């Protein structure tokens, strides 16, 4: 063994002796003052000391200062000659190669020493608290003193030598690495490696972005295609609704519109084709037409509302004994006129006699007129007499019609519309067209509209003058005279 190695071993043995004394004597004395069992309490003391040195900075500095004093006493070196910094360098230099000792600063040496001591204390405490060593430390201490301390010193020296070899290898590996010549080159190499990693991340993100954009484009095309199909279907449906609303047996337009989604009416392209105001007007007009068609359909089905033609479609020449309807009369009014005419014929009166008789007595009075009955029954009510008096001042409808005989209806209309010459021209044109149609000798055309219309019943009178209904009805009745059968 050379002198250098002997110097290193002496330093390691001094280091081991200090900490073995702490574990074997100092911590054992602290465990004796506790109430728990000595074994358990000694284990707590060992663990507490290890954690305190590692985690508590003040406890570590106190421990290092105590070790510095112990080292000076053992080596018999004056503390003035060996200061604290030299002490740290002496301990650390025994673990690292000499060629690196001068290149390492004092701060780095202090950090290396702290790591070495914490690691050493942790391993030594673990070895002492094993089942092999713990009984010899607690029991029969005097008999086992030399044996236990020797084993602890051997373990301490072996661990420190092993640690020295590890540090040597680290420094040798570092020496094999070619360091940059300057600090700038080192910074450049570090930034270059970091830049390469960033470029790799950028490439990955770019490829991911491209894939996402491709997926987005595909989804957008699908969406536009579906949207166009949807708008086309909605427009076709709306056109179908408009066509169906014009038919008589159409479903109400509002029912179809309610089934449509609200997005259909808020579509931009659809709003351009049909604005909102125009669409509302169209819908309102369609609804009005639908209601009008429905009302006309119901009116046409009613038997009391059959129209009576005003032109020469059925009756070619008016008859003296058969009334020709001049207004929109019903079948009931027509039958009543027939009955009145038959009664007059039965009693031997003709139409001329009835007219002459009516001229002498224009008003037929009853035995008790309505006014006299009202006055007789309401003598105590003077208000009703006043009402009748007021009524006398008002001409009746017959007088009004007599006054208006000199002014036909057309003249009244033309007189009322003097300020509108175009209206007068339209009325005159219509009148001329009617006169031209009457003067033309056109054949009688059966109106197909009246195929299912009511047909006048043919009356047959017996010898007593009473009429009886015939079971035969003519489908081509032309409004001629009624046949009287007295056979």
Curated annotation (Swiss-Prot):
| Protein name in UniProt | Uncharacterized protein B475L
Q: Which residues form a coiled coil?
A: 196-235
Family, similarity comment: Belongs to the asfivirus B475L family.
Membrane-crossing ranges are 7-28
| Protein's UniProt keywords contain S-adenosyl-L-methionine | no
Q: What induces it?
A: Expressed in the late phase of the viral replicative cycle.
Keywords assigned by UniProt, alphabetized? Coiled coil, Glycoprotein, Host membrane, Late protein, Membrane, Transmembrane, Transmembrane helix
Membrane topology value:
Single-pass membrane protein
Please name the source species. Answer: African swine fever virus (isolate Tick/South Africa/Pretoriuskop Pr4/1996) (ASFV)
Its Gene Ontology cellular component terms are: host cell membrane; membrane
Residues with an annotated glycan are 73, 83, 195, 462
| Taxonomic lineage from the root | Viruses, Varidnaviria, Bamfordvirae, Nucleocytoviricota, Pokkesviricetes
Q: Where is the major localization of this protein?
A: host cell
Region Disordered: start-end pairs: 294-324
Biased composition regions of type Polar residues, renumbered to the chain = 294-305
**Location in or out of the cell:** Host membrane
């Amino acid at each position: 063994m050379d002198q250098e190695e002997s110097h290193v071993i002496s330093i390691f043995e001094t280091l081991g002796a200090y900490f073995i004394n702490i574990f074997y004597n100092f911590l054992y004395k602290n465990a004796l003052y506790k109430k728990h069992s000595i074994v358990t309490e000694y284990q707590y003391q060992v663990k507490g000391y290890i954690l305190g040195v590692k985690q508590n900075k003040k406890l570590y500095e106190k421990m290092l200062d105590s070790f510095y004093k112990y080292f000076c006493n053992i080596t018999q070196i004056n503390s003035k000659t060996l200061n604290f910094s030299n002490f740290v360098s002496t301990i650390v230099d025994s673990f690292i190669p000499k060629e690196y000792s001068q290149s390492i600063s004092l701060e780095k040496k202090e950090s290396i020493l702290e790591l070495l001591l914490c690691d050493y204390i942790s391993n030594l405490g673990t070895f002492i608290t094993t089942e092999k060593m713990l009984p010899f430390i607690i029991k029969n201490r005097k008999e086992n003193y030399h044996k236990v301390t020797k084993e602890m010193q051997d373990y301490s020296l072996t661990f420190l030598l092993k640690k020295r070899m590890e540090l040597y290898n680290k420094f040798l590996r570092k020496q094999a690495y070619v360091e940059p010549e300057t600090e700038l080159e080192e910074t450049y190499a570090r930034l270059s490696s970091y830049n390469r990693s960033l470029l790799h991340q950028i490439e990955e993100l770019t490829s991911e972005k491209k894939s996402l954009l491709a997926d987005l484009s595909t989804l957008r095309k699908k969406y536009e295609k579906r949207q166009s199909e949807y708008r086309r279907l909605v427009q076709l449906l709306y056109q179908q609704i408009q066509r169906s609303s014009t038919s008589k047996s159409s479903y109400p337009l509002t029912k179809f519109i309610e089934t449509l989604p609200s997005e259909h009416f808020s579509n931009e392209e659809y709003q351009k084709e049909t604005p909102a105001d125009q669409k509302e007007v169209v819908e309102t007009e369609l609804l009005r037409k639908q209601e009008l068609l429905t009302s006309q359909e119901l009116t046409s089905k009613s038997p009391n509302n059959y129209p009576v033609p005003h032109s020469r479609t059925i009756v070619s020449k008016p008859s003296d004994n058969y009334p020709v309807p001049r207004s929109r009369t019903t079948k009931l009014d027509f039958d009543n006129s027939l009955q009145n005419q038959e009664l007059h014929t039965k009693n031997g009166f003709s139409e001329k006699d009835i007219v002459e008789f009516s001229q002498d007595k224009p008003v037929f009075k009853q035995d008790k007129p309505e006014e006299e009955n009202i006055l007789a029954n309401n003598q105590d009510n003077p208000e009703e007499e006043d009402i009748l008096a007021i009524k006398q001042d008002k001409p009746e409808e017959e007088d009004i019609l007599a006054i208006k005989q000199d002014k036909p209806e057309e003249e009244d209309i033309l007189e009322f519309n003097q300020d509108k010459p175009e209206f007068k021209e339209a009325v005159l044109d219509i009148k001329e067209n009617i006169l031209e149609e009457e003067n033309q000798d056109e054949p009688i055309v059966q109106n197909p509209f009246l195929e299912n219309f009511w047909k006048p019943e043919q009356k047959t009178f017996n010898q007593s003058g009473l009429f009886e209904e015939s079971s035969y009805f003519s489908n081509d009745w032309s409004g001629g005279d009624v046949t009287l059968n007295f056979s």
